[in-house]
Amino acid sequence: MSVDLFPNDRFGAEDKYDNFKDAVKECSWLIEEIVKPQLPNIIDNFSKCLEMLESDQIFKMPVSNGIPNESNKQNDSPTVKGVITRQGQYIVDFHIVVRFPQFQRGKQVMFRMNTGLNFLLIQFSKIMTHLKNILEILNQLQVATDVSEFVSKFGVAMELLNHSLILLQNPPRDLVFPEDNNFAMKEMFQDCYSVCESTAHILGLELTLCRNELCIELRNLIKVTKKPWCEIDSKTGRSFCDQIRNQVTNERNKTLSKILSENGVQVQDSTLLNHIISSFQSEAITLPEAQELLRRGVTFDNRVVMECEKLIVSTSDPTLISISAKLNSLKASMANHQANLVASKQLSTYK
């Protein structure tokens, strides 16, 4: 036995039916009978996630890139080892020993967080704020009667949930190199540049959430001292290197040599003699040197640097792993409700 379904098929004359009113009733039924009964369970799960984030429990997590110091002396690879401690949205202790072969001739450098200082994990804090806002919206929806208001606010809750999941996976641009301007290093360690800076190098530190883990990135950066490439415009915060790179992008009809010449930079031939001469003349540079500066040079913490060594380590945070699983499950459930609500609302707005 088979059944054929005919959309919008009605008993009796079509003019006796009001499609708009029927669609509104259908959307209202969907809200009252399907979505609202699920809200208490959804609210409970969001509350548990927020409770985990706000917990005062202390988590001590090891930090290591897995290369022993003895082995490191043989293969000359960067190493890091230590412990990071989190309580709620704050890092309350951070103690690591770092070694970069090209920094201070491979000497081990110890970073110990200032006693009594708490470093705010901005992503963590934003997720907590989002979850609080989601809970407020969902509690309002439990008593909402207007169909359009319900659908609109449900959509806002979904946007906040999606953004929370993005924050767990990837840090915002302003928290990573070079836009972060060594924020974590300056916030966590008193007089940090006495430890992380040498005559020719500077160390950079990032501490973010990435792929549901606490991620630490350490960079050994070479200072660019050649003028005018190292100069920073005090008004714009952009370096000469940034300006030339931007001009090369916008004026593709010009050669790099011509652009450099227009900006007062002498381009020398790549011979040994000229290379030696150019190293003593601040404005003179060979074309390969200029290309290297444009390719690798970045403005960082009010100076121009080039990365020469990097370490990336992550440590599993049980709270982040658990919350990520719960939020993804909530997203699947709420996305299904949202799709049905949007489809039903579109019918109700069509006359």
UniProtKB/Swiss-Prot annotation:
InterPro entries associated with the record = RAVE2/Rogdi
**Any GO BP:** vacuolar proton-transporting V-type ATPase complex assembly
- Where is this protein found? Cytoplasm; Early endosome membrane
Q: Which GO terms describe its cellular component?
A: early endosome membrane; endomembrane system; RAVE complex
Keyword Transport among UniProt keywords: yes
Among Pfam families, the record links this protein to: Rogdi_lz (PF10259)
Show the PANTHER family listed in the entry: LEUCINE ZIPPER CONTAINING TRANSCRIPTION FACTOR LZF1, PROTEIN ROGDI HOMOLOG
Task performed by this protein? Component of the RAVE complex, which is required for stable assembly of the vacuolar ATPase complex V-ATPase under many conditions. May be required for transport between the early endosome and the late endosome/prevacuolar compartment (PVC).
Q: By what name is this protein known?
A: Regulator of V-ATPase in vacuolar membrane protein 2
